């Protein structure tokens, strides 16, 4: 997750003959500049999963993450009593996708009557121990915490901290994406809801969009976002 490493990887792929690139990277000025330089050189880039919105990327393939964050805010606002304190964790604020989720969540919570002072935020850098520590320290300082929103990885780190504090089943946990770990946590009741996204499309589409741009001159729309969003719980996972 170091910008210079991403730039070096882009340069390496170009040296190896890549004519187009699909990218998921930090929204960092140095990476955006390199994408612009590649565009000037006739090498298009498609972003997926997390966007570089201010770059000259050809297209973004992924979920409408701001809307997904708003959906999470809607769910949380209906699960937590008015006045309840909520923790919102984000993996890395330099990833546009994480920021979009968090901003959408905060916006909808505010609309539903939860002011900013009721929402605590923590950055976990997608690290298990950092997630565990952020949740554990928040629960220690605020034993009345009513809900946790996770816009990051390592949901299991959050759940373990809740268990260690003896709060399992006493607060609501809402996250994003689905894997075997999250599926198990949903079924056992440790996570209440998750909002998945179409990773298959995000991996499948970029090479074809690049091919069409390079070989056929067909330029895609600026964004190819997932259509319908779904909400998973223990009953439909």
List each model region and its residues.
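Local beta-strand N-terminus motif with an aromatic residue
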Residues: 18, 57, 144-145, 191
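Non-catalytic structural scaffold of enzyme domains
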Residues: 11-15, 83, 107-112, 181-187
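Hinge/cleft segment of the Venus flytrap/periplasmic-binding protein
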Residues: 109-112, 198-237
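A conserved helix-loop-strand patch within extracytoplasmic ligand-binding domains
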Residues: 68-86
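Flexible loop/hinge segments that line or gate small-molecule binding clefts
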Residues: 30-67, 179-188
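Hydrophobic alpha-helical
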Residues: 6-9, 13, 19-39, 105, ...
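Structural detector of well-ordered beta-strand residues that form the stable sheet scaffold
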Residues: 46, 87, 149, 172-174, ...
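Hinge/beta->alpha junction and helix N-cap segments in small-molecule ligand-binding domains
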Residues: 1-6, 27, 50, 61-71, ...
């Amino acid at each position: 997750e170091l910008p210079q490493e991403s730039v070096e990887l882009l340069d390496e792929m170009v040296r190896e003959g890549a004519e187009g690139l699909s990218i998921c990277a930090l929204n960092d000025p140095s990476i955006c500049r390199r994408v612009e330089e590649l565009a000037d050189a006739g090498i298009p880039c498609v972003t997926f999963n997390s966007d570089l919105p201010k770059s000259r990327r050809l297209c973004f393939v992924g979920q409408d993450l701001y809307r997904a964050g708003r959906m999470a805010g809607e769910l949380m606002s209906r699960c937590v009593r008015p006045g309840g304190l909520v923790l919102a964790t984000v993996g890395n604020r330099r990833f546009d996708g994480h920021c979009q989720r968090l901003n959408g969540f905060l916006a909808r919570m505010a609309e539903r009557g939860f002011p900013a002072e009721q929402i605590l935020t923590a950055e976990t850098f997608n690290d298990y121990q950092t997630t565990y520590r952020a949740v554990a320290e928040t629960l220690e300082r605020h034993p009345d915490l009513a809900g946790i929103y996770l816009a990051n990885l390592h949901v299991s780190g959050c759940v373990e901290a809740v268990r260690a504090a003896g709060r399992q089943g006493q607060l609501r946990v809402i996250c994003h994406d689905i894997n075997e770990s999250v599926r198990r946590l949903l079924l056992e009741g440790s996570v209440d809801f998750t909002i998945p996204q179409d990773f298959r499309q995000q991996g499948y589409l970029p090479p074809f969009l690049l091919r069409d741009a390079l070989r056929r001159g067909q330029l895609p729309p600026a964004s190819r976002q997932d259509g319908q969003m779904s909400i998973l719980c223990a009953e439909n996972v």
